[in-house]
Amino acid sequence: MWATYVFIAVSLACANGYSSGAPESVCQDMVPKHPVPPQSTPPPYTITTSTKTVKAGTPMEVVITGKKPTDKMRGLLLQAREGTKIVGKFTLAPNDPFAQLLNCGEPGNAITHKKHDEKNDKQTVAFTWTPPKDFVGEIKFRATIALNGAVFWVGVESGPVKVIS
């Protein structure tokens, strides 16, 4: 009987996760505080970019796609990184039903999901990212993507993007 209660409590916690988005406390390690570990299998998501080279201060698009129609996203934390340093800013479409900006040390330098109904889970999401005007270097987009509260992948990365002056 006791095991049943524990199972139900853990299941509810997994299902709920951070339904209103990732908290700032996970900005560095990007690991959700769900009561289950991340998946160790390859992620069923890809992160692609509109360009492999971008001029500093010039916006570009980043797209996250589930490989199959069933590979939808319930949760997301996305950043652009040069090594461990979070770089640049994101912009969102007005009234985006899925995503919101998160401040990981700087305003708008990360994106997370917002509370939404399951019908608004997404197979594909696209965002605009702009590198700082004074930044030159190489970044990768890095994400934590949750299929649901109990199934998520940490460290999903894009290929490198060069930022030039």
UniProtKB/Swiss-Prot annotation:
Signal peptide: 1-17
Cited CDD domains: Reeler
Residues of the Reelin domain: 18-165
Protein's UniProt keywords contain Disulfide bond: yes
Induction summary: In larvae, by bacteria (E.coli and M.luteus).
Cell location: Secreted
Major subcellular location class: secreted
Record Pfam families: Reeler (PF02014)
Family under the similarity heading: Belongs to the insect defense protein family.
PANTHER family for this protein: CELL WALL INTEGRITY AND STRESS RESPONSE COMPONENT 4-LIKE-RELATED, CYTOCHROME B561/FERRIC REDUCTASE TRANSMEMBRANE
Protein name: Putative defense protein Hdd11
Lineage: Eukaryota, Metazoa, Ecdysozoa, Arthropoda, Hexapoda
